[in-house]
């Protein structure tokens, strides 16, 4: 029996009603300690229990080797303090951040809320982090302490104090500090929790950012852009065009949504207000279908030429398979992992292997875009 899913999670979410941000802080501290003691008995037990290695799940994409397609989404390890632990928890890659050039406290608390009835979370964190320089220092130390077995991405955001017209330089300053320490990089212009940030998805604004980054990117690190689920098809098509123009490694689809339709939660206990009255982005199950629609659209528009990392509402092997067959080469989890617990990654990987066997596939790559291919 999965003790976390059936006992600990319901207790924390529905009975004790622990503050989600406090619980997250304690968890990341524990993971940070484990990350700094890579040969510990605890790490060995975690790896044995939670990891699954199978050549059918391996892929080489944009020059990087991924042992499996399930990654940790940005937002959990904002400062890269636990970068060395994620492979032991079964992940095939992990994305650190979002990190900004200037350290910043984020938005006032409370700013993170669980919506158990919807299997969702609402957050308005506001890119709280210690800054790019602090992350760089930590990752240099991490490289000395352990050898990462999985690709590590770094998600870059705009500092709140930086005016929108200076955003490109702000992203560039962070990239310069971190470019030798991450395996791939993500331009986050889609969080709803930094004033004006989503306007950077506009073609002219985004073009300026990508142009500066690629000029600096002499070692050809893979660069992605992460987009919002709330964009219309025309705006997404413009971003696809920019991805081709600036030779991006791919697109991450999607960030959290500002939509509130269909939610079962009437009142958030911490504030006494409805989700409709609270600012922030919704993640988890309510995002699942829309993020898959965006993945499908990108695949159809590009015929699979631009790799997609799919994220949003993944809780089960079926959810993961749906994202992959819609066109995602890789997937990321966060909210689902919080609800389902640490065994979720292994369960998804086992489920994907079963799907491959059922379809007579030798590699997970054969499943990417299968839904669209089969309709031709």
UniProtKB/Swiss-Prot annotation:
Sites binding FMN sit at 74-78, 98, 155, 188, 226, 254, 284, 313, 334-335
Task: Name the top EC class.
Answer: oxidoreductase
Q: In which pathway does it act?
A: Pyrimidine metabolism; UMP biosynthesis via de novo pathway; orotate from (S)-dihydroorotate (quinone route): step 1/1
Which GO molecular function entries does the Swiss-Prot or TrEMBL record give?
Answer: dihydroorotate dehydrogenase (quinone) activity
How does the record classify its membrane topology? Peripheral membrane protein
**Residue ranges crossing the lipid bilayer per the database entry:** none
Give EC number(s), comma-separated: 1.3.5.2
Which cellular compartments is it found in?
Answer: Cell membrane
Q: Which InterPro entries match?
A: Aldolase_TIM (IPR013785), DHO_dehydrogenase (IPR050074), Dihydroorotate_DH_2 (IPR005719), Dihydroorotate_DH_cat (IPR005720), Dihydroorotate_DH_CS (IPR001295)
- GO annotations of cellular component type: cytoplasm; plasma membrane
* Name used for this protein in its record: Dihydroorotate dehydrogenase (quinone)
Gene this protein is translated from: pyrD
